[in-house]
């Protein structure tokens, strides 16, 4: 019983009050950091016109349109890599994480859905960063019909300065 009492007191002392330090497992290459990137993630659906693959001219292949969108996103990701490149968190990033489209090899697909991951350095606004991506795709793929879902994640980057990140997270 005495051993249980000692353990109980130890646990209570560790869990009471605010911690002196918190460890968050981020991919930092074992470097100590005091901030981390935020993220905004959403799905975009590129629309086409379905038809039988023996008459592809009667449809609009959403996979071809989505391929152009993916290449535009790759181009923007390269531009983002140059922005804030000396930031302790590294540069902002943009990635297509998943792509789904088509229902059969003999059908021209009418839709393709891409899941977008835009990582933010502290100080970047999640929704403004999302808007930048949407606008870039619209400018570079003007003929594509694209529907953007609301973000399923929008989290500002965190910094040891805290105030800017907290304001961005509330908006």
List each model region and its residues.
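Fold-level recognition of mixed alpha/beta catalytic cores in primary-metabolism enzymes, strongest
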Residues: 1-75
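Metal-dependent amide/peptide-bond hydrolase catalytic core
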Residues: 43-171
